[in-house]
């Protein structure tokens, strides 16, 4: 179950990365690199931290192939992206929610304590975006006042709470994916941020 869910999450995040690369006028190869970094960066770091070696992308070619399909989809679907920036934001928000739940579930399967599961959920969700923004020569969203990591953290805590209530795991994943997506989109829509004052 985790394998197929992760492939879907990789696809969604890689589309986000590829479109972000296209915003910077990158060619297909550049879009692919940024797509791979976005789709697989967070999961790879998570695997390194929990000792899941080698990381899945080096054990199964499906991950890189899915990223390639995502980039083709992003590149040739470009005529339909009337506002690429908005599409990137929406797709990125959806992938955040998916990756938080994925990182937490994989960490739970490794028997990690609850707080480590939440940390790994945030890392899985956010680190690909960090690499994407670095590749685009931008300050990563997570290091700005954007409600980004906070949304991931909140979603992770809610997921653990739903688990404690005995809710079916799949339902919990669906709920927090929607929750994190909505938080991010509201933050973008209404320019909500975390004040440094």
Question: What is each stretch, according to the model?
Answer:
Residues 1-40, 44-56:
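N-terminal topogenic module of multi-pass integral membrane proteins
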Residues 14-24, 47, 71-85, 130-141, ...:
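C-terminal ends of transmembrane helices
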Residues 29-37, 59-64, 85-96, 120, ...:
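Cytoplasmic-side transmembrane-helix entry/capping segments in multi-pass membrane proteins
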Residues 35-43, 91-105, 123-124, 147-160, ...:
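Small-residue-rich segments of transmembrane alpha-helices in multi-pass membrane proteins
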Residues 33-37, 44-50, 119, 123, ...:
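Short, structured motif recognition centered on aromatic/hydrophobic residues
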Residues 1-4, 48-58, 103-116, 161-172:
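Helix-coil boundary and interhelical linker segments in multi-pass alpha-helical membrane proteins
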Residues 1-10, 36, 55-69, 113-125:
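Structural signature of hydrophobic alpha-helical transmembrane segments
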Residues 69-106:
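Ordered, amphipathic secondary-structure segments that act as subunit-interaction surfaces
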């Amino acid at each position: 179950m985790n394998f197929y869910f992760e492939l879907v999450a990789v696809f969604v995040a890689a589309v986000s990365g590829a479109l972000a690369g296209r915003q910077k006028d990158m060619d297909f190869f550049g879009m692919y690199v940024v797509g791979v970094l976005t789709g697989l960066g967070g999961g790879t770091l998570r695997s390194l931290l929990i000792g899941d070696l080698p990381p899945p992308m080096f054990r199964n070619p499906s991950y890189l192939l899915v990223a390639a399909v995502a980039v083709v989809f992003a590149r040739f679907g470009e005529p339909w992206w009337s506002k690429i920036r908005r599409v990137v934001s929406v797709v990125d928000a959806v992938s955040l929610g998916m990756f938080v739940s994925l990182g937490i579930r994989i960490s739970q399967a490794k028997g990690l304590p609850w707080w480590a599961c939440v940390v790994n959920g945030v890392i899985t969700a956010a680190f690909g975006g960090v690499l994407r923004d670095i590749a685009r020569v931008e300050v990563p969203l997570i290091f700005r006042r954007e409600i980004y990591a906070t949304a991931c953290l909140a979603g992770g805590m809610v997921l653990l709470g739903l688990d404690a209530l005995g809710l079916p795991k799949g339902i919990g994943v669906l709920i927090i994916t929607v929750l994190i997506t909505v938080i991010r989109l509201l933050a973008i829509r209404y320019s909500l941020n975390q004040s440094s004052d």
